[in-house]
Amino acid sequence: MIGFAPISAPDALAEAAARARQDALTKPRGALGRLEDLSAWVASCQGQCPPRQFQRARVVVFAGDHGVTRSGVSAYPPDVTAQMVANIDGGGAAINALADVAGATVRVVDLAVDAEALSEQIGAHKVRRGSGDIATEDALTDDQTAAAIAAGQQIADAEVDAGADLLIAGDMGIGNTTPAAVLVAALTNTEPVAVVGFGTGVDDATWSRKTAAVRDALFRSARVLPDPVALLRCCGGADLAAMAGFCAQAAVRRTPLLLDGMAVTAAALVAERLAPGARQWWQAGHRSTEPGHQLALTALALDPVVDLRMRLGEGTGATVALPVLRAAVAALSSMATFAEAGVSTACDDAGATEPPES
């Protein structure tokens, strides 16, 4: 049985206190821009003002292969997925380097890599070897879909129970932007050509094959809409279903989460339908160059923290945003107020509301 506990909203009183404190800090009102909004969001998620600095930020990378790669939709062969799982586990991937700088740790989980699991721990939630070719068949069976969503829930629970106070969802899977594009197109009523990007750097011919595969899968998806579970079964994959479960359960557990790029945000779009209101607990770490990513962000009403023209996946874009989130927390919690510092506020009699930039 697939189900999530009702989502409760972040703490509105803590958010209000954070905004009031921002206005009292030794700076012009609003001078820290988006950092002020982010700090208020963290305070609301933690239910306290000032908020605590993150002590255990955790990146979870969900890995899986996709049968649609047989249609030639990617610039890389499918066996790269298994090789990259080993690379991430060994600490040699981009996500490892960026997480180290950002003060986060990394875990990789194998949901549907088309190879034997690298280790018992990595493969503890493995659902199958490779998801089906969504252009011609369902990605998963009913039981596999339920198992993958449950795996995401269990992984989120395990991380929060172990002390994680911020979660980042990442992905690893050759060809996974193809099912991700289908999910976004289906849930935003968008044509394939508007959601399909160049992924890992495909050429025009590969893009055309990818668009055709998305078109065929989207046609198949029409019979299951608007059921989010059936959509994952039909046109998703075990990794995407697990990410959806993970994102939704993070919200159930009242734990803030940073979304990464196209694959993760497509899964989050489904997660919002599995657990309405979950998006209140998420921030979009970055904006990918994949066109479907902006469509998904718009549908979720999320603004990216950074935009660095990244399109790697793995959780890298979200992890780059983590230091920005840390800076937001530090400013709100560590700065002095005007009263504490003995600094004069804006001159009311002169009609000024803010001192000029120095």
Curated annotation (Swiss-Prot):
Q: Which reaction does it catalyse?
A: 5,6-dimethylbenzimidazole + nicotinate beta-D-ribonucleotide = alpha-ribazole 5'-phosphate + nicotinate + H(+)
Sorted alphabetically, the keyword list is: Cobalamin biosynthesis, Glycosyltransferase, Transferase
In the UniProt record, does the keyword Transferase occur? yes
Annotated Pfam families: DBI_PRT
Q: Which domain of life is it from?
A: Bacteria
The cross-references to InterPro entries, in alphabetical order and at most eight, read: Nict_dMeBzImd_PRibTrfase, Nict_dMeBzImd_PRibTrfase_bact, Nict_dMeBzImd_PRibTrfase_N, Nict_dMeBzImd_PRibTrfase_sf
Q: What class of enzyme is it?
A: transferase
Gene Ontology BP, a term: cobalamin biosynthetic process
Annotated family: Belongs to the CobT family.
- What name does the UniProt record give this protein? Nicotinate-nucleotide--dimethylbenzimidazole phosphoribosyltransferase
Tell me the organism.
Mycobacterium marinum (strain ATCC BAA-535 / M)
Gene behind the chain: cobT
